[in-house]
Amino acid sequence: MAGGVGGRVVVGRHVYGNLYGCDARVLGDEAALITIVKEAVRVANAMLLSIGSYRFGPNGGLTVFAVVAESHISIHTWPEHGFATVDVYTCGDHTDPKAAFDFIVEKLSPKKIEVFYGDRSMYSE
């Protein structure tokens, strides 16, 4: 049930946001972003299953994503605009998606951020 009535059966927490005014060089650096996402997995206390990336054209943005046992972490970049979106979704009480999100924000050094939170849990009736 929405609103947390009853006991929580499945724990799911989603932290996501928009980062403005990031350094275009970092947003275009595939190796750096992969390293950041791998470290964010550790910070979240999640278990890395796979990591991947995709560059959109020779001078385009990047998508870097980690599939973790608990769900996923992703960064999508638009270097030409100094803009990135970050998505950290984890399941389980042992994970800390907010810490992973904050770590990524620290590494991308945006001038402005918007952050959003979603409860993706299931509650017993």
From Swiss-Prot:
Reactions performed catalytically: S-adenosyl-L-methionine + H(+) = S-adenosyl 3-(methylsulfanyl)propylamine + CO2
Cofactor: how bound: Binds 1 pyruvoyl group covalently per subunit.
Higher taxonomy: Archaea, Thermoproteota, Thermoprotei, Thermoproteales, Thermoproteaceae
UniProt KW keywords: Autocatalytic cleavage, Decarboxylase, Lyase, Polyamine biosynthesis, Pyruvate, S-adenosyl-L-methionine, Schiff base, Spermidine biosynthesis, Zymogen
Pathway(s) where this gene product acts: Amine and polyamine biosynthesis; S-adenosylmethioninamine biosynthesis; S-adenosylmethioninamine from S-adenosyl-L-methionine: step 1/1
Biological processes, Gene Ontology terms: spermidine biosynthetic process
Function, in words: Catalyzes the decarboxylation of S-adenosylmethionine to S-adenosylmethioninamine (dcAdoMet), the propylamine donor required for the synthesis of the polyamines spermine and spermidine from the diamine putrescine.
EC main group: lyase
Sequence positions bearing Pyruvic acid (Ser): S71
Name assigned to this protein: S-adenosylmethionine decarboxylase proenzyme
Site residues, Cleavage (non-hydrolytic): E70, S71
Lineage top rank: taxon: Archaea
Pfam families the record matches: AdoMet_dc (PF02675)
Cofactor(s) the record lists: pyruvate
Assembly and oligomerization: Heterotetramer of two alpha and two beta chains arranged as a dimer of alpha/beta heterodimers.
Recorded GO CC terms: cytosol
Transmembrane segments: none
PTM section of the record: Is synthesized initially as an inactive proenzyme. Formation of the active enzyme involves a self-maturation process in which the active site pyruvoyl group is generated from an internal serine residue via an autocatalytic post-translational modification. Two non-identical subunits are generated from the proenzyme in this reaction, and the pyruvate is formed at the N-terminus of the alpha chain, which is derived from the carboxyl end of the proenzyme.
Record: active site: S71, H76, C91
GO molecular function: adenosylmethionine decarboxylase activity
Family: Belongs to the prokaryotic AdoMetDC family. Type 1 subfamily.
E.C. no: 4.1.1.50
